[in-house]
Amino acid sequence: MEFPTQPKLVDGKSIIYPPGVKEITDKISNDEVVKRLKMVVKTYMDMDQDSEEEKQQYLPLALHLSSEFFLRNPNKDVRLLVACCLADIFRIYAPEAPYTSHDKLKEIFLFITRQLKGLEDTKSPQFNRYFYLLENLAWVKSYNICFELEDCNEIFIQLFKTLFSVINNSHNQKVQMHMLDLMSSITMEGDGVTQEQLDSILINLISAHKNLNKQAFDLAKVLLKRTAQTIEPCIANFFNQVLVLGKSSVSDLSEHVFDLIQELFAIDPHLLLSVMPQLEFKLKSNDGEERLAVVRLLAKLFGSKDSDLATQNRPLWQCFLGRFNDIHVPVRLESVKFASHCLMNHPDLAKDLTEFLKVRSHDPEEAIRHDVIVTIITAAKKDLFLVNDQLLGFVRERTLDKRWRVRKEAMMGLAQLYKKYCLHGEGGKDAAEKVSWIKDKLLHIYYQNSIDDKLLVEKIFAQQLVPHNLETEERMKCLYYLYASLDPNAVKALNEMWKCQNMLRSHVRELLDLHKQPTSEANTTAMFAKLMTVAKNLPDPGKAQDFVKKFNQVLGEDEKLRSQLEVLISPSCSCKQADVCVRDIARKVANPKQPTNPFLEMVKFLLERIAPVHIDSEAISALVKLMNKSIEGTADDEEEGVSPDSAIRAGLELLKVLSFTHPTSFHSDETYESLLQCLRMEDDKVAEAAIQIFRNTGHRIETDLPQIRSALIPILHQKAKRGTPHQAKQAVHCIHSIFSNKEVQLAQIFEPLSRSLNADVPEQLVTPLVSLGHISMLAPDQFASPMKSVVANFIVKDLLMNDRSNGDKNGKLWCPDEEVSPEVLAKGQAIKLLVRWLLGMKNNQSKSANSTLRLLSAMLVSEGDLTEQKRISKSDMSRLRLAAGAAIMKLAQEPCYHEIITPEQFQLCALVINDECYQVRQIFAQKLHKALVKLQLPLEYMAIFALCAKDPVKERRAHARQCLLKNISIRREYIKQNPVSNEKLLSLLPEYVVPYMIHLLAHDPDFTKPQDIDQLRDIKECLWFMLEVLMTKNENNSHAFMKKLCENIKQTRDAQAPDDPKANEKLFTVCDVALCVVYNKSAPCHSESSKDPVLPLTFFTQPDKDFSSKSYITDEARNLLLTGKPKPMTVLGMVNKPLNATGRRPYSRSTGSEISNNVSINSESDASVANRQSSEVPEIGVSENDENPVRLISVPPAKTETVKNKEVNLDQTAPSNTGTERGKKRSAASAGAENIRKESEEKKADNISATPTPKPRRGRPPKSESQGSAAKNDETSKPSGRGRKRAAANQESSGAQEAANAKVPKQDSTAKKTAQRQIDLHR
């Protein structure tokens, strides 16, 4: 018989187990312990708080379960069951726990916490019991009992760490909610959250932990949201300790404060209400790295999608924006990077960012400027309307950045925007309109000197503007409407691009031709020169030279490669063929073992430039069809934003340009039939372009297309006789180019036109004169003689020497082309006819050139009024002066005529650049530059630019300086690339312009008193205008060479007047001023020039080493010139001296903004300057060229105001003695001179003469009005050889041989003849 075991006593009370449960001791097995504990768990689970009897009964058992045996039992099942029992005990006995010892309570809760780790494995058979444990603890809030314990924090930290560590993605929502309830009750119901407890939560927000356990991160997020109000002060205290007080030791998370702030802000911005002011404090830290960290943080806070921090905390936002101007580069860089996200997520903040991005777009750091572009473009790609026009303007500016990386990013970014919104039409019409300017801007960049820029524009054009991979019809439609919508400068750039590509193709073609020739020294030299030319058309020409040589070597060794390259550059190569050839050649050159192959990259650059990827016969045919649709009215012109007329005109212009570069592609019946249809259209421009296309492409029409020939001939005859002047010119050239019986064809035009000339009907004269001039130039052998009688009897006697109509007396110096009188238009063409006739003959056997030059000189002397009847208007006189000056310059381009142009005639021509009319100066300077830059004019004509120092308009002076820079660089480059003889060197070396300039300035009509300091200042300004550009670099000891030039001049005499002491004194004085400038501006050098300069004998006598050694300017004058204050008057005029032409408007040196907006003053790029014709001169109203409006200069001389309604009448003050002033008239600097001249000077002037002597006007020598007044003038004021007075003109004989000069004034017979010209400065 078994007796029951005596119950064990706990606290003097016996332990009572539930029915059926035996005593649990350490004597039994673990399995038995587990079995008995499960029954105990069941008992406690079924009990509730109201069972007072049972609570008392099982109290000893509850105490027993907290014994060491259970709490430290090694069996996890035992521990789990005990934990469940203890949890139920806390539930049953709540709110008081049966355990009174704090140590015991702590031990129990740490034990329970350890058991919660079992929640980790959801597939465990015991998981439900673990879940019950968690649920029980959370529901009862059992852990709140620990608040009474002194070291409860240890329990809570352990609990939080346990729960965050066990949660995983296999847990359901209930598990997460119970964990959350458990932790939030502890957080919210306690007296506060300790730092360690806070750390146990925040650590789950750090990236490393977040990536390891996303569920822990989510749990922490929800916990912080739920307990935000309670936990916020603790968070604020933590960040205050770390950020403000710098106590990083308070937490292991101190180094992650900025990451934590970002995460907390994303969870709930209210958690950081007290932290944000601390960040503002940190933004102003002295530590750059610290500011950078804060900026990175705030960039994320402000830029996040749903953030309203910028509106909620304006002080912090403004402080953050201030970091865009931080002294620390990484901080500025980070600020700029942030802007992209901000623009995309918060468009309303774009206005705040714009000004700061503007400043950063000019940041000295390249990386920052680059990132500004990336920022704006990235936002614009997402949605164009996220960025305003001002931001896009910053990108536009950076296309001209000094750094290639920045320029490239800006250009590519804009190109991508254009393709997205204009080509693909994303964003609709509004978006396309917003970026429609991009195509023009990108093409304008082709004007830049950098080869990298040019190549990128070509790449952008081929890939973004007109993608070459489109089908032919689509590609040509894209090109057709692009060309029609480009601005004029962009069109010129695109034309230049095709021209450059075509030129490079021809260079490569010539290189291949050299490979076909037998090897020789001459062949090797020619090949090397060609390789250098090709290399200059590739990036980094220095390295490219080596690669081009290597490629040439490969070409020489690989015949198949040569044949493929020949196919690529052949005129008949199609676009598809070109793609295949480029791929094949690149594959052959590539080296598989070399991933980055600079040689291959260079070859690709070359192939991309020469490959015809856009235009072939099929493409031309597609373009013609598009144009036909526009003519028929069935095209999509209006939808593309182009009017049908504009589309047709642009289409013809496009075809015209392509006819130069791809003439073979035009040769088809269909194309020429369409062009014939265009010829019959009423639009003059369209017909003119069509004729030009026939001229460029029709060489095989006569043999291959007889029907086209039959239809074309009568049209060309009609255009040559009755078309517009431009059509007539093109028609004559077209006949001359494409027909074998051109002599017969031209005769059929020449004879009726020459017989029908009638000066009484000037409206019908212009076209015949154009046709006759070009016929005589193209076929001089046939028409030179019959033209001579036309010139003598009609052109000179009947047309030029008679005024049949009265001009408009409105006093303006210029008028629009459409307002020019027909008679003056005819006279202008008559002058051009004379020049073309002479250029055709290319000889002066009949002395017709001398007569013509005298006629042109007389035109300049008479200010354009050759008859001196005063019937012609001022604006018409300006036109004729320009025509005469341009004609002399044109003749000078032909060596046989250059030799007979006298120094006096050259000086008259030069003075046109100082004409009183703005447009005359402008157009003449453009023509001068165009001829010089092509090396067609002798070097002495470059000296004319020195006179531009006297131009009153700043932009004209700037343009002249650019012209000088361009000309000098071209000449120096030519000398480097082409070995030249010493004789040829005289006409090319830029430094040789110095003697011509000195001679020209010595004969300046304004230079009358060699010792007058004001006149010397003028001379010094002109000299420095040229010398500054020449002396930029001391290449090849050029400074010493120029000094030697000046010294040599002082050993000669003025060949124009060798026995005139006054003329020689002026020459030596100018020479001394030049030496003064050279000595002052050159770097100190003791070496002498190794070369002995040769002086042109046309202007200087043979050197006499003992002739002149004295100085012609005093030391005082020299000091004043070098260090004196600027003159108180403008260069072009003398203040307080009345004009000698009634009502003539005085000049004043002014800035561009002070000139009427009707005057074109913008200095243009070389490309546009070279193409600008006189017909493009803008219309002007009240402007520099009006006689009456006066420009007043106020006391501060830097500012001027235009007084439009004030008139000056000089009839009473200017005596009629203009004929006595030999040399050009010169405009007064300004009215209102009392604001500039000193009062003492005015009184002195008044005392000298009641009627001051009028100052000659810049531009031309004035005509004589009376012999009597001429006699009263001081002889010293007369420059020699300026053309005779009109009174002497009647003394000329009019023999048959000199019929062309019947009424043309000749040079004064008393003038000294110049020495035989010894040096050919042109050939």
UniProtKB/Swiss-Prot annotation:
Q: Which CDD domains match?
A: PDS5 (cd19953)
The processes (GO biological process) annotated in the record are:
cell division; DNA repair; mitotic sister chromatid cohesion; negative regulation of DNA replication
Is Transmembrane among the key words of this record? Answer: no
Q: In terms of one coarse class, where is the protein primarily found? A: nucleus
Where on the tree of life does the source sit, at the highest rank?
Eukaryota
Keyword Transmembrane assigned: no
The HEAT repeat units are at 385-421
Q: Which InterPro entries match?
A: ARM-like, ARM-type_fold, Pds5
Renumbered to this chain, the Low complexity biased-composition regions fall at 1153-1165
According to its UniProt entry, the function of this protein is described as: May regulate sister chromatid cohesion during mitosis and couple it to DNA replication.
Protein name from the UniProt record: Sister chromatid cohesion protein PDS5 homolog A-A
Q: Which organism is it from?
A: Xenopus laevis
